[in-house]
Amino acid sequence: MIGLPAVLLLPIAAATPADDVKACLDRYDIACARQAAGSLGSDDASLAARAELEFALGEFTPARDHLKAASRSLASAEGYAERLALFERSAVATADFVSETRADVTVRSRPGFDAVLTDEAFETLQAAHDRIGPLLGGAPPGGVRMELYPTAQRFIDASSLPGSAVRTTGVIALSKWTRLLVSSPRALGRGYGWKDTIAHEYIHYIVAWRTEDRAPVWLQEGIARSHEALWRTDQPEPLAPTHASLLAEALANDSLLPLAKMHPSMAFLSSPEEASLAYAQVSTMVVYLRQAKGPGAVSEVLDRVREGRDALQAVADVGAGGDQAAFMAGWRAYLKGLKLVGRKLAEAGVVLDGAGDEYAVDPVLGERADLARAARIGDILLDAGRPDAALVEYRKAAPDGEPASPLLSSRTANALIALKREPDARKLLEGSVRDYPEFAVTRTMLGKLLLAAGSTGAAFTQFRHAVDVDPFDPASQATLADLYAARGDAPLSERHRRYSRLLQSNEPATR
């Protein structure tokens, strides 16, 4: 998601320094805006322009103060009060942040446990710049600035998104005002793929710069979702199983979402399922375009959109000789060729800032109190040393025809392990990881089984993925440190050992 800064200006003559700052910011050219700001004066229009530049740079307190100082003639201007309130909320949300810059990347975050994110945040952004930027025709000048918010509430305060929209769709990252606003994995009850999300938001920034912000949301999201893994791999990743399931169902029922419904933001769709379906649709459209015409096709589309071409027509121009119907028909044929398996899977609900326990974040048990009740009885029996009886209850929590539950799979695996049935537990966990790859607890359990069986390479893969989703488990960090040491990688072993020690210390409470 992307948005333009709205510089609050008085009706003034053209080509003033304030106009120049605005023009630079509209082009996402921070270096240009800095240079233009050198000619700003002390009039209200100049103060407002300086405030907008500072806001784009993440300097919220001076931005607020300069915009407030411009109130002599701007107080009654349309949007002034809302803009000033946003600057104030942003200043409060980041008041305890520290800033670190490496090369032309700046990351701001709260001291404490979120320090385990900063090294890999820098590495992800640098890799995205080096690997993805050239595919899209370059990257914005002036570097990139990112904030890592420790809670979803702070992200909401600083993002301008309604809290209700964030809680409905789970959108907890944003590219806006030439900055990346990203929530810590702690903001979601089970963590999330935050590094791919960083790359995703950076791609939004690139697309906005390349097109002068003329790309509609569906095209932005299609490019970002299809390219977000390319910072670490050479080809777009397959659809997540839950997304593939939703897309297969929509194709079968002829219930694909119209592109217009995705405007003005995916955050305003009606449910997590609808948002996931939208992402699946638009990302596969872009993957199809890449496969049909090569990786450079996306950059060609951006060139045309920048020139004012309608986005879908630009895609059709590059992908199907200008024939929109032919492109869409080709895309549908491509989807059929994927042989999407319509396995019944559930989409996890949105649980933010510790609002629920591990049952609440489960995609099945979080929605079915009756099944959760049976599973909780199983937990009691397992804790009492009665794994056979626990299995009976766990089976009640997984009736035929219902989607699989990742939490229930891990609980059942625990009971099987207690009964010395490790091969059965491993098979169950492997299936759960295939269906729900972003559940760290399942990957951690599978990793432990693989380690016990001497499969250190496979165990490393599971613990690496688990820590990528939820980096705040000190035990997983310690195990990953051991596995890096066994691979002869002393620097990464020490990094994750340091993270484990940090996570076992006391951290001040955050709001």
Where do the PLM segments sit?
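TPR/TPR-like alpha-solenoid helical repeat scaffolds
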Residues: A48-L57, A75-A95, L407-R411, A415, ...
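Beta/coil-rich, acidic/histidine-enriched accessory regions frequently appended to metallopeptidases
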Residues: T16-A36, D65-A69, E273-S276, E307-H465, ...
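Juxtacatalytic substrate-recognition/specificity segment
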Residues: D96-V217, H227-P236, A248-A260, P264-P272, ...
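Sec-exported extracytoplasmic/periplasmic mature domains
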Residues: D26, A56, K68, R72-A75, ...
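Amphipathic alpha-helical substructures
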Residues: D19, R27, T61, Q235-A275, ...
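Elongated, non-catalytic scaffold/linker segments and compositionally distinctive motifs
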Residues: A23-F87, A91
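Bacterial Sec-dependent signal peptides at the C-terminal "C-region" and cleavage site
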Residues: G3-A18
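Solvent-exposed, acidic/flexible segments
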Residues: D26, I30, D44, A56, ...
